[in-house]
Design a protein with these regions (language model features):
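A short acidic, glycine/proline-enriched capping/turn motif at secondary-structure boundaries
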Residues: 74-77, 92-93, 102-103, 144-146
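Short, flexible, mixed-charge acidic loops at enzyme active sites
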Residues: 83-98, 150-163
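Active-site loop segments of alpha/beta catalytic cores
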Residues: 116-344
Length: 344
């Protein structure tokens, strides 16, 4: 492979510099992405391997990031289970018949990745061909708690009151669904590795909606089940649970992940102190809003972040997804500042 920095960092092997990529790097901040989006709706892009691969490769070609992540969406799993999904501009994703009672769970069907999710696997296969070993390819999926939250709420939420109400009123049913999702997600990630993904990331996007007790009961065990099942495929596993920085050590222990994502609300040096480079690799964690700053200031803040992580067992990234109105030149300043860094 021409550039294996990312995979070496995942395995905590020596690297010349930290690798860099960005969550949501194939996204609306790129004019080239918007050009594809103008001729196709979001879900068609996700479900059409040729379009998904076209935008997957854009940040590799335009910004020289050290890894590609397949263009897809975490909600393809509930959709594969039979839920009707739409994604509307200005509104975001929405399930048309959310699961508001345990009886609704019977509507869900079992998933065989090579059947209902074949389009994702075909996109991974095609992306590996098109990348031609220039950089590694990352696959991903949503974590059980986050998926269940969307499936019950029907859309994103500030309070997640409906999902949390299910935990309170019907905990046994919630556990049953979370266990089912953990198996489905884990099997999906294994299938992604078999289709060509060289690492996979689990996104528990709404982990921060739960307090410590509920996180430990309803999110962490199933995040761990999915991660450990995925690890059986042999590729590095990354876990990112924003809003749960207080639990970094527990997440590392329960999931056995090779890489733990660090959000922008967690102090970089503190994360490294709590999870030393000898134990696990860390990924993150520049606040995406710093990409609104001048390129000079972006470089300064990025260097501070790199120094805080210490240069070992670290994958440079943002502490959340890149925002859609960030200037491309500012994203490039972030990537270039990592590529040019000479070490602490």
């Amino acid at each position: 492979m021409a550039n294996d920095l990312f995979l070496r960092a995942c395995r905590r092997e020596p690297v010349e510099r930290p690798p860099v990529w960005m969550m949501r790097q194939a996204g609306r901040y790129l004019p080239e992405y918007r050009a594809v989006r103008q001729r196709s709706d979001f879900l068609t892009m996700v479900r059409t391997p040729e379009l998904a691969v076209e935008v997957t490769l854009q940040p590799v070609d335009l910004l020289a990031v050290d890894a590609a992540i397949i263009f897809s969406d975490i909600l393809v799993v509930p959709q594969a289970m039979g839920m009707r999904l739409s994604v509307d501009d200005g509104v975001g994703p929405r399930f048309h018949q959310p699961l508001r009672a345990p009886a609704d769970f019977s509507r869900l069907r079992d998933v065989t990745p090579e059947e209902q999710l074949r389009y994702v696997l075909d996109a991974l296969r095609l992306a590996r061909q098109e990348l031609n070993d220039r950089v590694p390819l990352i696959g991903f999926a949503g974590a059980p708690w986050t998926l269940m939250s969307y499936m019950i709420e029907g859309t994103g939420s500030k309070s997640f009151s409906q999902a949390k109400r299910m935990l309170v009123e019907s905990p046994a049913s919630a556990h049953e669904l979370l266990g089912r999702l953990a198996r489905t997600v884990g099997e999906f990630l294994i299938a992604q590795v078999e289709a060509g993904a060289q690492a996979v990331q689990l996104f528990d996007s709404w982990a921060g909606a739960l307090g410590p007790r509920d996180f430990r009961e309803f999110a962490l065990p199933y995040l761990g089940q999915a991660a450990r099942l995925a690890r059986s495929a042999g590729a590095p596993v990354i876990v990112f649970a924003p809003g749960s920085g207080w639990a970094l050590e527990e997440i590392a222990t329960v999931t056995g992940a090779d890489v733990i994502g660090v959000d922008w609300q967690t102090d970089s040096a503190e994360a490294r102190r709590r999870l030393p480079a000898s134990r696990v690799a860390l990924q993150g964690n520049l606040d995406p809003c710093w990409l609104y700053a001048t390129p000079a200031l972006i470089r300064e803040r990025t260097r501070e972040m790199l120094e805080a992580f210490g240069g070992r067992s670290h994958i440079a990234n943002l502490g959340h997804g890149i925002l859609p109105d960030v200037p491309v030149a500012h994203a490039r300043a972030f990537v270039d500042s990592v590529r040019e860094w000479q070490g602490p």
